[in-house]
C-alpha cells in the first residue's frame, strides 16, 4: 500500500520550531536518565524519537526553561506508556488504577516515598517546576485533565481484557481524552505567558476550537500509527474501528478517517473566525492561545512524519499488505 494518503494531512496554517530545540532535546534525555526512566530497551529508541523536538514544535515561542518543562512532560507521557507496555501494567487494570491514583496524588502535592517508582519521582519533579510558574487554579485544571487521560487509559484496558472493539462514536468520544492532549493544551498558556479568564476559556467557541484541534491531532496520529496498532493487536485506532464498524477494506477505512480529519480541519478554521470580542487584553491572549493550538496541530503531524515511534516495521507492513489485499 502506498503512502500517498499522508499528503492529505494538510493544514491552512504553518508551524514553527523553537531555536532551543536541539539543546532541549538533549536535556530531556539527560533528565530522563537522571530519574531512571531510560531502561536498556528504551535508551537507544529514545535518542531517535526526539521528544524534545516535538515540544519545540508545539511550543515554539516558549522561553528556554518553560520549553524544557514541556519537553520533559511530553517525554514522561511516552515513557509511562512504554513502561506500562513493558511491565504488563497496560493490561492489568488493578495495577494501572493503583499507579494512576499515586500519580494523581503527586499532582495534588504529595511527596514521593521510598516504594515509589521512577515515574513517580519524575512526575514530582515536573509538578514542582510547574508550581513555580503556574497558579493554583491552573494546577487543578491540569490535574483534572490528567485524571481524564488516565480514565480513558483504563477504558482501553477494559476493552483489551474483554476483547472488545468500540464503535466509531464511542471511540471518538474517548479519544478526546486518551491522548492527554487537553493536558498538553494547558501548557500553551504557560508557554505563551498568558492567562485566559474563566469566561473566555469556557466560551462555547473556544471549547469547540479545543475539541476540533484535539480531534485533528488524535485522528492524524491514528492515520499515521495504525500499522503499529495492527501489529500489536490493538483496535483502539480510528482507522481500525471504522474498518470494523463498516466492514470495509483497509484503504477505504483510511479514506474515511482522512475525510473525518479534513472535515474537522474545516470546522477549526471556521470556528477560528467566530471567536467573540471580550476586550483588547483578553482577545490578544485568545489569539495567542488559538495560534498555540495551530502550533500543536502542525507539530503533531510534522514530528509524527519523521519520528520512528510510528514508523511501520517490516512485520507491520506485511500485515497491512495482507489485509489490504483481502
UniProtKB/Swiss-Prot annotation:
It catalyses: (2E,6E)-farnesyl diphosphate + H2O = (+)-T-muurolol + diphosphate. GO terms for biological process: terpenoid biosynthetic process. The record marks 78 as: Plays a critical role in the stabilization of intermediate cation. The keyword Phosphoprotein does not apply. Disulfide bonds: none annotated. This is (+)-T-muurolol synthase ((2E,6E)-farnesyl diphosphate cyclizing). Mg(2+) 3 binds at residues 221, 225, 229. The lineage of its organism: Bacteria, Bacillati, Chloroflexota, Chloroflexia, Chloroflexales. Substrate binds at residues 175, 228, 309-310. Gene3D superfamilies: Farnesyl Diphosphate Synthase. Its cofactor is Mg(2+).
Amino acid at each position: 500500500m502506498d503512502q500517498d494518503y499522508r499528503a492529505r494531512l494538510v493544514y491552512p496554517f504553518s508551524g514553527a520550531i523553537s531555536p532551543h530545540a536541539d539543546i532541549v532535546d538533549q536535556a530531556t534525555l539527560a533528565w530522563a536518565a537522571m530519574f531512571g526512566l531510560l531502561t536498556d530497551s528504551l535508551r537507544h529508541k529514545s535518542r531517535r524519537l526526539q521528544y524534545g523536538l516535538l515540544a519545540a514544535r508545539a511550543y515554539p515561542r516558549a522561553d528556554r526553561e518553560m520549553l524544557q518543562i514541556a519537553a520533559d512532560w511530553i517525554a514522561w507521557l511516552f515513557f509511562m506508556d512504554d513502561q506500562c507496555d513493558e511491565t504488563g501494567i497496560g493490561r492489568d487494570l488493578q495495577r494501572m488504577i493503583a499507579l494512576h491514583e499515586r500519580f494523581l496524588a503527586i499532582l495534588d502535592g504529595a511527596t514521593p516515598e521510598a516504594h515509589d517508582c521512577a515515574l513517580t519521582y519524575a512526575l514530582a519533579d515536573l509538578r514542582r517546576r510547574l508550581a513555580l510558574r503556574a497558579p493554583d487554579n491552573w494546577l487543578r485544571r491540569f490535574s483534572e485533565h490528567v485524571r481524564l487521560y488516565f480514565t480513558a487509559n483504563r477504558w482501553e484496558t477494559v476493552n483489551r481484557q474483554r476483547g472488545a472493539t468500540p464503535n466509531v462514536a464511542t471511540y471518538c468520544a474517548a479519544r478526546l481524552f486518551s491522548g492527554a492532549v487537553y493536558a498538553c493544551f494547558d501548557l500553551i498558556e504557560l508557554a505563551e505567558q498568558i492567562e485566559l479568564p474563566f469566561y473566555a476559556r469556557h466560551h462555547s467557541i473556544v471549547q469547540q476550537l479545543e475539541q476540533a484541534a484535539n480531534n485533528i491531532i488524535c485522528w492524524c496520529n491514528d492515520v499515521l500509527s495504525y500499522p503499529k496498532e495492527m501489529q500489536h493487536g490493538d483496535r483502539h485506532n480510528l482507522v481500525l474501528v471504522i474498518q470494523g464498524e463498516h466492514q470495509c477494506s483497509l484503504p477505504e477505512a483510511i479514506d474515511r478517517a482522512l475525510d473525518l480529519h479534513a472535515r474537522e480541519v474545516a470546522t477549526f478554521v471556521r470556528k477560528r473566525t467566530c471567536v467573540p470580542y471580550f476586550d483588547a487584553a483578553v482577545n490578544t491572549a485568545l489569539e495567542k492561545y488559538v495560534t498555540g493550538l495551530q502550533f500543536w496541530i502542525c507539530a503533531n503531524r510534522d514530528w509524527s512524519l519523521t519520528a520512528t515511534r510510528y514508523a511501520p516495521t517490516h512485520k507491520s507492513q506485511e500485515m497491512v499488505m495482507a489485509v489490504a489485499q483481502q
